[in-house]
């Protein structure tokens, strides 16, 4: 079974080819760098900084503790320029590499699916060739989604009904490498019955996909309700 969680464009396919060509250690370095840049704390710091020298930690294939904590301060750090030299590809390919990593991580962060299914999608749909690289992405994804799933399973969410929904529009700079490129982001602001604020940030395609998913869910609910109504009024049930 394939799910519609990501669209692979020609540019994305070219970026994936670059990913496949990277040595494993370089791959994990770029993976964790991109992940750190997408985290709220780093993004906030980047917005107030005029320098490009953002650091990233490296990891090795053998050191499992590093992969569990990719931002460990005991590991060597690289600036963006040093990372570009480490990757060793032309600048345009390096920019495409960062954007492809960012695209993949952003898309998998918006879906909660079985790890085995995501593993198959990374292998078959994205055509990642190295199983170790696929496993590294999976471990990072599991580490990020586990707290979310634990929170959803906690008792305090059982009656946590959404009572209010609002929205606003933000503009963000897409990367350090292309300061002039800005992306409009829709922010859905929801308030629960217990007073908790939930903010979800999405691009226009992601917002459209969310809308289509809601439409699909509503269609299935309507169909189930129609079947239930038909069954209740059938001659055999009277």
From Swiss-Prot:
Please give a single GO biological process term from the UniProt record.
motor behavior
Q: How does it assemble?
A: Component of the commander complex consisting of the CCC subcomplex and the retriever subcomplex. Component of the CCC subcomplex. Interacts with Smn; along with Sbat and Hez may form an accessory subcomplex involved in SMN complex function.
What are the boundaries of the region Disordered?
43-78
Q: What else is known?
A: 'Valette' is named after a Grand Master of the Order of Malta and distinguished warrior, Jean Parisot de Valette.
Knockout phenotype, as recorded, reads: RNAi-mediated knockdown is adult lethal. Conditional RNAi-mediated knockdown in muscle cells is also adult lethal; adults show severe mobility defects, reduced flight capacity and don't survive beyond day 5 post eclosion. Conditional RNAi-mediated knockdown in neurons or specifically in motor neurons reduces adult viability.
Quote the InterPro entries the UniProt record gives. Answer: COMM (IPR017920), COMMD10 (IPR037361)
| Composition skew (Low complexity), residue ranges | 43-77
Described purpose of this protein according to its UniProt entry: Scaffold protein in the commander complex that is essential for endosomal recycling of transmembrane cargos; the commander complex is composed of the CCC subcomplex and the retriever subcomplex. May modulate activity of cullin-RING E3 ubiquitin ligase (CRL) complexes. May down-regulate activation of NF-kappa-B. May have an accessory function in the survival motor neuron (SMN) complex. Required for neuromuscular function and organismal viability.
Q: What is the lineage of its organism?
A: Eukaryota, Metazoa, Ecdysozoa, Arthropoda, Hexapoda
Which organism is the protein's source? Drosophila melanogaster
Q: What is this protein called?
A: COMM domain-containing protein 10 homolog Vlet
| Record-linked CDD domains | Commd10 (cd04758)
User: Which residues are in the COMM domain?
Assistant: 161-225
Q: Give each disulfide bond as a residue pair.
A: none
């Amino acid at each position: 079974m394939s799910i519609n969680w990501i669209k692979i464009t020609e540019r994305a396919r070219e970026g994936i080819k670059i990913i496949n060509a990277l040595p494993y250690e370089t791959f994990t370095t770029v993976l964790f760098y991109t992940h750190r840049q997408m985290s709220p704390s780093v993004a906030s710091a980047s917005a107030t900084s005029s320098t490009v020298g953002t650091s990233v930690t490296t990891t090795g294939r053998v050191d499992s503790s590093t992969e569990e904590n990719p931002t460990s301060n005991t590991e060597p750090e690289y600036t963006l320029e040093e990372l570009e030299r480490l990757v060793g590809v032309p600048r345009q390919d390096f920019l495409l590499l960062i954007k492809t990593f960012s695209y993949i991580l952003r898309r998998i962060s918006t879906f909660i699916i079985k790890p085995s299914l995501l593993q198959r999608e990374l292998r078959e749909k994205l055509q990642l060739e190295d199983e170790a690289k696929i496993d590294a992405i999976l471990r990072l994804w599991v580490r990020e989604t586990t707290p979310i799933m634990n929170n959803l399973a906690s008792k305090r969410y059982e009656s946590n009904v959404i009572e209010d929904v609002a929205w606003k529009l933000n503009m963000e700079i897409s990367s350090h490498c292309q300061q002039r490129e800005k992306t409009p982001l829709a922010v859905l602001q929801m308030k629960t019955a217990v007073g908790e604020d939930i903010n979800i940030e999405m691009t226009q395609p992601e917002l459209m996909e969310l809308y289509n998913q809601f439409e699909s869910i509503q269609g299935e609910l309507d169909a189930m309700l129609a079947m239930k109504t038909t069954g209740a009024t059938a001659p055999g049930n009277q």
